[in-house]
Amino acid sequence: MTRLENMYKKEVVPALIKRFGYSNPMAVPRLVKITLNMGVGEAATNKKVLENALADMAKISGQKPIVTKSRISVASFKIRNGWPIGCKTTLRRSKMYEFLDRLINISLPCVRDFRGIPPRSFDGRGNFNMGVKEQVVFPEIDFDAVDAIRGMDIAITTTANSDAEAKALLDAFNFPFRN
């Protein structure tokens, strides 16, 4: 069991029950999954770029990502239907908690001029989305071996019914929100 899983069971659940008045510990919001997505537009013309993005994503997430393909043809982007244009992976259970721990305690403090995450990134249904502009903030990525700086999207899916509950859950995990 990871450090954040222990923290969730021993500290977060009782604190949220006290704050929101849940009658059952199973009603307390919990993390369901974390989805990482990396769009690589240059992959339509250069296959090596996609291979490097897949390798970076595999190092960051600890599991093999899948290639995402375009759903429609767009002439202005010079892509056709079915061409590979990115990669994504979904983390659940212990890998999810390990990634979240590394994100909160190691990666986000390494971001230049980091002042906190804006709390307006909730979607209204208790899920949280954020972007990272550089993949080199993760300790698994060797800065000298990187061919290009790529960003990624991170979507944290919870069972919370509202943004307030989801924010309280992520606050309990010491998520660095901006004031």
Curated annotation (Swiss-Prot):
Highest taxon listed in the record's lineage: Bacteria
One annotated GO molecular function: structural constituent of ribosome
Keyword RNA-binding: yes
Alphabetical UniProt keywords: Ribonucleoprotein, Ribosomal protein, RNA-binding, rRNA-binding, tRNA-binding
Coiled-coil regions listed in the entry: none
Signal sequence region: none
One Gene Ontology term from the biological process aspect of the record: translation
GO cellular component entries: ribonucleoprotein complex; ribosome
InterPro entries reported in the protein's UniProt record: Ribosomal_uL5 (IPR002132), Ribosomal_uL5_bac-type (IPR020930), Ribosomal_uL5_C (IPR031309), Ribosomal_uL5_CS (IPR020929), Ribosomal_uL5_dom_sf (IPR022803), Ribosomal_uL5_N (IPR031310)
Family: Belongs to the universal ribosomal protein uL5 family.
NCBIfam families: PRK00010.1
Record function comment: This is one of the proteins that bind and probably mediate the attachment of the 5S RNA into the large ribosomal subunit, where it forms part of the central protuberance. In the 70S ribosome it contacts protein S13 of the 30S subunit (bridge B1b), connecting the 2 subunits; this bridge is implicated in subunit movement. Contacts the P site tRNA; the 5S rRNA and some of its associated proteins might help stabilize positioning of ribosome-bound tRNAs.
Subunit text: Part of the 50S ribosomal subunit; part of the 5S rRNA/L5/L18/L25 subcomplex. Contacts the 5S rRNA and the P site tRNA. Forms a bridge to the 30S subunit in the 70S ribosome.
Protein's name according to its UniProt entry: Large ribosomal subunit protein uL5
Gene: rplE
